[in-house]
Amino acid sequence: RVLSIGLTISLIMAGAPNINALSSIEKIQGKDRYETAAKIAQKQTYENVVLVNTDNTLADGLSASGLAGTVKAPILLSQRNSIPSDTEKMLKDVKKAYIIGTEDSIGKSVENELKQKGIEVKRIGGNDRIETSYLIAKEIASIKPIDKVFITNGYTGEADAMSASSVASRDGAPIILTNGKNVPFEKKEGVQCYALGSEEIISNDLVKKTNAVRLAG
């Protein structure tokens, strides 16, 4: 899981370059997931950050990739009731922090600590990971027009979402989690949906309902 989130955040930072243009690969690795995320953030210039807790699931981090790209922010990792020292070091010049998840994921104590540092805080969290991903999409839409969304299964499709996270970040495109059968939104005209995963992950009915292009191996 530490390797997975490190890879995901690396992709979010790097975007999606042409594979033929890659002449070398830089290894970024910390002693744990918190330091790895901080080392990646060191490669960026930013005034905003996105904070997620990946102790139990990667879902919030994957949903946040489009928002991170939209506001030009690194994804940093938090514990529920405290900010790890490696994460705290990366907050020095931050003006705004987006907390992903309810207080069950990242508690009020973390929010208060950020505010004490003079950082504006916006929390985006729903009743579950599906609603949270939809609320993140709404936040992106309030900042910029959306012309594409990725939909995947929020419980069995994390690997599929990970494969699209770099593109979602590059394009500021939401990754919306579903139960594989329904979506928490009405598809708008001019928005292209991409369904991530096979029929076992995303049903054919959902693909038809959203007029989505299925991306599956």
Language model segments and positions:
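Extracellular glycan-binding segments that recognize GlcNAc-based cell-wall polysaccharides
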Residues: 2-13, 17-217
